[in-house]
Amino acid sequence: MKKIFSLVLLGIALFTFAFSSPALAADSVNGAKIFSANCASCHAGGKNLVQAQKTLKKADLEKYGMYSAEAIIAQVTNGKNAMPAFKGRLKPEQIEDVAAYVLGKADADWK
């Protein structure tokens, strides 16, 4: 019985680790610095100067399917429409940090 319990706990731990979000390990403080240097010219305060309806506010991120670290990472990495790709300009870890920062600010309504 003890062996089964241990195996179940191990399975839960492995499952949790395997499917954890990359934003959990990201550094939102570093993300704030990177955002300020690379993103704030168009997205200051969570706004969008190019497409005003597509802000970085939580409701808009949810509406447009962007309220996840994975979606933000893909957008920042590859760009889309008027937004440039940052794949060659930022390291993957830096992009993860930006995603963590954006999600944190969206949850706090950019205050």
UniProtKB/Swiss-Prot annotation:
GO terms for cellular component: plasma membrane-derived thylakoid lumen. Binds 1 heme c group covalently per subunit. GO terms for molecular function: electron transfer activity; heme binding; iron ion binding. It is found in: Cellular thylakoid lumen. Functions as an electron carrier between membrane-bound cytochrome b6-f and photosystem I in oxygenic photosynthesis. Pfam families: Cytochrome_CBB3 (PF13442). Belongs to the cytochrome c family. PetJ subfamily. Residues 1-25 form the signal peptide. One of its GO terms (biological process) is photosynthesis. Heme c binds at C39, C42, H43, M83. Monomer. Keywords: Electron transport, Heme, Iron, Metal-binding, Photosynthesis, Signal, Thylakoid, Transport. This is Cytochrome c6. It comes from Nostoc sp. (strain PCC 7120 / SAG 25.82 / UTEX 2576). NCBIfam families: Cytc6PetJCyano (NF045930).
